[in-house]
């Protein structure tokens, strides 16, 4: 990993030089039709706010709804000695299936998705989650506030781990909470990335989270035959993936190697892209919660059985800018993505193996 980080720092320096000397000015960049800000694919829900829902991912949480149809899944260890939580992101309220078990909100996820005007859905939240929502005047749909008006549980309502919701249920409470499911001009964070024109009536759009394209030439991969992936968040938390050549996707596994299934349809969750980003983290004032540096870092991108070592930094046209191992700007293949933030503070690590079991990192 030390060699990886040395390479990452070198790549970042190279990319900075390239950006300084070769970046196109805004006036020279060709205008493009907006795409789905989560997948880079055709925009099916124009003018709508994406919806982000935190769900429980503890080892005992064997029933999870909505995984297989989320456009984007985020994962990070946000507190020591606790399980990771997943954040399932959908392109609009109308695209949300039954989702759960809904868990406490995490400000880390809202920070990552602020450029997309995300609508947060949660079951309560800690001090830092609430501080973030209050500071930016964001309103979440919170199960502790609206209860059975938007959340359900097949058993006793006190059975917290099984609370779930859906797009139809959420729609029923947005009006009373004064929450709009549509993008609003006042919250578009980068006006140069917005297609809104109040005079022409054009629908608003927001920047993509990741640089993506449907078609295009990719740089040579740093490794091929990347068949098995394991993200070890800490001693108790890990997520695995196995590559399926027929579907050209990475299929999600629990820490014990069992399939991570969507309770809505019994399907194993899979992704076109795996993006594992390394980020410096620090303990917050409570001595438990982790804060992540979202300015720059190294990482790995996996797609169709290939691996690229990358560096990342904040973007303007997209939330993240990515660079390959030669310091050149990198555009991912459009599709569903899993994005993990991995910290060095908790001994987290990434293992990628080929079909013979050889480590590729």
What spans do the regions from the language model cover?
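Bacterial N-terminal signal peptides that target proteins for export
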Residues: 1-9
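A surface/extracellular/periplasmic glyco- and lipid-processing/surface-interacting theme
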Residues: 29-74, 81-361
């Amino acid at each position: 990993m030390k060699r990886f980080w040395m390479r990452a720092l070198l790549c970042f320096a190279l990319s900075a030089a390239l950006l300084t000397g070769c970046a196109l000015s805004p006036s020279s960049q060709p205008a493009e039709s907006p795409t789905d800000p989560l997948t880079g694919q055709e925009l099916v829900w124009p003018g709508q706010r994406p919806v982000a829902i935190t769900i429980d991912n503890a080892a005992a949480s064997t029933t999870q709804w909505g995984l297989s149809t989320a456009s984007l899944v985020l994962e990070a260890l946000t507190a020591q000695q606790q399980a990771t939580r997943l954040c399932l992101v959908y392109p609009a309220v109308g695209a949300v299936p039954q989702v759960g078990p809904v868990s406490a909100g995490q400000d880390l996820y809202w920070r990552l998705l602020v450029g997309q005007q995300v609508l947060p859905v949660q079951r309560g939240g800690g001090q830092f989650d609430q501080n973030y929502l209050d500071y930016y005047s964001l309103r979440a749909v919170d199960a502790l506030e609206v209860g059975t008006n938007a959340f359900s549980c097949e058993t006793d309502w006190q059975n917290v781990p099984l609370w779930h919701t859906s797009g139809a249920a959420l729609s029923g409470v947005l009006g009373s909470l004064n929450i709009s499911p549509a993008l609003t001009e006042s919250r578009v964070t980068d006006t140069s990335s917005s297609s809104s024109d109040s005079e022409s009536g054009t629908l608003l759009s927001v920047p993509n989270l990741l640089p993506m394209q449907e078609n295009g030439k990719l740089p040579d991969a740093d490794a091929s035959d990347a068949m098995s992936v394991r993200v070890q968040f800490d001693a108790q938390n890990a997520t695995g993936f196995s590559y399926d050549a027929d579907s050209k996707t990475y299929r999600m596994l629990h820490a014990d190697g069992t399939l991570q299934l969507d309770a809505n349809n019994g399907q194993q969750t899979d992704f076109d892209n795996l993006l594992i980003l390394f980020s410096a983290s620090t303990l917050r004032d409570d001595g438990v919660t982790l804060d992540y540096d979202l300015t720059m870092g190294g990482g790995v991108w996996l797609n169709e059985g290939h691996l690229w070592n990358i560096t990342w930094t904040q973007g303007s046209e997209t939330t993240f800018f990515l660079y390959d191992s030669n310091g050149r700007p990198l555009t991912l293949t459009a599709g569903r993505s899993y994005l993990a933030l991995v910290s060095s503070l908790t001994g987290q690590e990434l293992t990628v193996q080929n079909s013979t079991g050889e480590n590729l990192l």
